Regions:
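ATP-dependent carboxylate/acyl-activation modules
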Residues: 1-230, 235-390, 404-408, 412-420, ...
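Redox-cofactor binding/interface segments in oxidoreductases and associated redox assembly factors
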Residues: 83, 330, 393, 624-625, ...
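Generic hydrophobic/aromatic pocket-lining and core-packing "Φ" positions
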Residues: 342, 441, 610, 636-637
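Short acidic/histidine-rich motifs immediately flanking catalytic phosphotransfer sites
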Residues: 385-390, 616-622, 642-646
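A short helix->loop->beta-strand "cap" motif at the edges of active sites that frequently abuts
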Residues: 423-426, 578, 642-648
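Rossmann-fold NAD(P)-binding glycine/threonine-rich loop
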Residues: 440-441, 653-666
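Glycine-rich, highly charged phosphate/nucleotide-binding loops
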Residues: 599-617, 626-633
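Rossmann-fold NAD(P) dinucleotide-binding segment
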Residues: 622, 626, 630-653
Length: 666
């Protein structure tokens, strides 16, 4: 999930620094009708302190953190203050976790009483380790407002109510709303006031709020927020006729973590010591944004280890422990499959026994898969259950992940934990498919014959979640099927089809060392056009069916492994014309790339320009886009601008939400 909550401290620093800097999203930027007060925020951070530390060590750490806050923020000793935990806790006031109108001595004592101690908020318990201290702002209740900006598939939505504060009530029922469609400008201040501020009598406050909302939305878009709520938002008018001050007293926010490459430097700068404390000698670049775990969900040592592994690889490794005493553990390949398996377990009434949630995907190495599997097996075998435990190693049909390679890592971990698995009475159920799936399943089946642990192995002949009811005793083995049968000696069998592909075999490929702008000679273009014309009459796809048996694609990016896999699949299916027409690689000149068609070599042209590739192969109406998350928006926009392209398959993960929504709207 890309939308990650941030601390109130960080959210207010972002807003304070960029409120007057972010470029407007309106057609014209109005003159601000409000004054921005000086930002004063002090953080008391004890996140490195553990509850298992001695009382003296915890007390010393608390005093050191309080002293540091006082040293960096001398204003703490001369003003009335507000103190509260800053750990993504909702309704802190109603939970007794808010101190108002206190001096620094009272704040320190209040923090000492609660720091590194467990508290219950509703049904959730957690340890308080981070506190926010800021000046107390006295104000009448009638100047408290509520504003929220949130993102939806079709655009952004601004909500506003003229009544804010603790007793705001049902926001959805009473809020006025303003929709901002994707790629559309924000309305002018008068329109904002007419849509959202009709219940405010004061013209001064209405003007201040209208221009503040314009600025707030500018920051929201500029910094890739996905949610931003201020309650209460206070407008303080002055007796001398100066601009009213707009103060955001309480704030909750989420950022799009996948947009860190785009906005990460801005997030860091607003939180640097030079900006926060105004000292010229301080570091001008702040720390990377911290995305804390939800209250009551501190990362365990194992979760932190997998998170560290995930950060060091291009693959995806995720682990969340739900119930360490649960008897159902999963090791699922793919984010979508992890949801499907969890839903299947919950649908059978075993949600309370589900011990973990996570996934491994993106072609992790054998070593990475071993470390991931070892971590899960270690957690699983720490405690015993009378009825034993179940390990579900599941997954759909992999695109590029080598099943045999990842299974080598899992098998290595299973062998290492053999005695613990036997002692814990663990049964293992496997369902997987994809590249080299037979080799991987064969190795897993052979392991089951020698390990001393029951291992049932199933392949693509079995429904993806069929092993779940079998593992949980809700279905018999006969209902699931006989399981994996090693029926094929090799995955690319001999074929009676022609040994050379149809269109590429007739291509007159240009010498890549020559300076000709086009790779494919007219004869090749004519062959491609003839192939398209021959199938046009009976192969024209319906508007709702993007693919047919004769669909041809352009592969964007230098991905020879993926292309070879597609050609192998074509050959197995006895296609006469390969599904890959050509490749596009913008960072090199036109050339050709060697591939195999069955056991024969063939050449595919590689173009530096997408437009040139499309013109040379007018029958190709699909693009498989391997561009990275940083460049996929620009490249996909170009693809969608070509009339012949009907389908674009985006492989990149971690595309910023705002980019994805713009692509959907094109």
């Amino acid at each position: 999930m890309s939308a990650k909550a941030i601390r109130e401290y960080d959210g207010k620093l972002l807003l304070a620094h960029y409120l007057q800097q972010s470029p407007t999203m309106a057609t014209t930027q109005p003159t601000a009708a409000f004054a921005q007060p000086q930002t004063r925020l002090a953080q008391v951070n004890l996140s490195e302190v553990n509850t298992t530390d001695s009382g003296d060590k915890i007390s010393a750490a608390v005093e050191a953190a309080l002293s540091r806050a006082e040293r960096l923020n001398p204003w703490l000793t001369s003003t009335k203050l507000v103190a509260k935990p800053d750990q993504l806790i909702k309704r802190r006031g109603k939970s007794g976790l808010l101190l108002l109108n206190a001096d620094w001595a009272q704040v320190k004592e209040w923090i000492r009483e609660r720091a590194v101690k467990e508290v219950a908020v509703g049904e959730i318990s957690g340890v308080l380790k981070t506190f926010l201290v800021e000046p107390f702002v006295a104000h009448p209740a009638e100047v408290e407002y509520y504003v929220c900006i949130q993102s939806h598939r079709d655009g952004d939505e601004i909500l506003f109510t003229h009544e804010g504060g603790v007793e705001i009530g049902d926001v959805d029922a009473k809020a006025l709303r303003l929709q901002v469609p994707i790629a559309q400008p924000l309305p002018d201040s008068e329109s904002i006031a007419g849509k959202l501020l009709a219940d405010i009598a004061s013209a001064t406050q209405r003007a201040a709020l209208a221009t503040f909302i314009e600025r707030l939305y500018a920051v929201y878009v500029d910094l890739n927020f996905t949610y931003l709520e201020i309650n209460p938002l206070v407008v303080l008018e002055t007796a001398d006729g100066a601009l009213p001050q707009v103060v955001y007293l309480d704030l909750a926010a989420k950022l799009d973590q996948t947009a860190e490459f785009e906005s990460g430097d801005k997030w860091a700068k607003a939180r640097s010591d030079a900006v926060v404390y105004g000292t010229a000698a301080a570091e001008a670049v702040g720390p990377a944004m911290d995305f804390p775990a939800p209250f009551g969900r501190e990362l365990s040592r194992e979760e932190a280890y997998i998170q560290e592994l995930d950060a060091k690889t291009g693959a995806s490794l995720k682990l969340t422990i739900l119930n360490k005493e649960g008897r159902i553990w999963t090791m699922v390949a793919g984010g979508g499959a992890s949801v499907v398996y969890s839903d299947a377990i919950a649908a059978l009434g075993f949600a309370g026994e589900l011990a973990n949630y996570g996934e491994y995907s993106g072609a992790p190495s054998e070593a990475q898969t071993y470390e991931y599997a070892k971590t899960i097996l270690d957690l699983m075998t720490r405690t015993q259950r009378a009825e034993g435990k179940v390990l579900i190693i599941g997954g759909g049909i992999a695109n590029f992940t080598n099943v045999a390679t990842t299974f080598k890592g899992i098998i290595r971990a299973l062998k290492e934990y053999r005695q613990a698995l036997i002692a814990t009475n663990v049964r293992v159920f496997v369902r997987r498919a994809g590249p080299n799936w037979q080799e991987g399943l064969r190795a897993m089946r052979e392991l089951g014959e020698t390990l001393g642990v029951e291992i049932r192995v199933y392949g693509p002949e079995t429904h993806v979640t069929a092993i779940v009811p079998l593992a949980l005793g809700q279905a018999s083995p006969a209902a699931v099927g006989a399981g994996f049968r090693d029926s094929l000696a090799k995955q690319i069998p001999d074929s009676t089809a022609a040994s050379s592909p149809g269109t590429p075999a007739t291509m007159d490929i240009a010498d890549p060392l020559q300076s000709r702008p086009a790779v494919v000679a007219p004869a090749a273009a004519a062959a491609a056009a003839a192939a398209a014309a021959a199938t046009a009459a009976d192969d024209k796809p319906s508007w709702y069916a993007p693919f047919t048996a004769n669909t041809r694609a352009i592969v964007y990016g230098m991905q020879p492994r993926a292309v070879q896999g597609m050609l192998d699949f074509d050959f197995i299916c006895k296609r006469t014309v390969p599904s890959v027409a050509c490749m596009v690689y913008p960072f090199g000149g036109n050339h050709v790339q060697k591939f195999y068609w069955g056991t024969q070599e063939t050449l595919l042209p590689v173009f530096a320009s997408l437009a040139e590739a499309a013109s040379q192969f007018p029958d190709a109406d699909v693009v498989v886009n391997f561009a990275s998350c940083r460049s996929v928006f620009a490249s996909t926009s170009e693809m969608l601008g070509l009339p012949q392209i009907r389908t674009v398959a985006i492989i990149a993960e971690g595309v910023p939400e705002r980019h994805a929504r713009k692509l959907i709207s094109l």
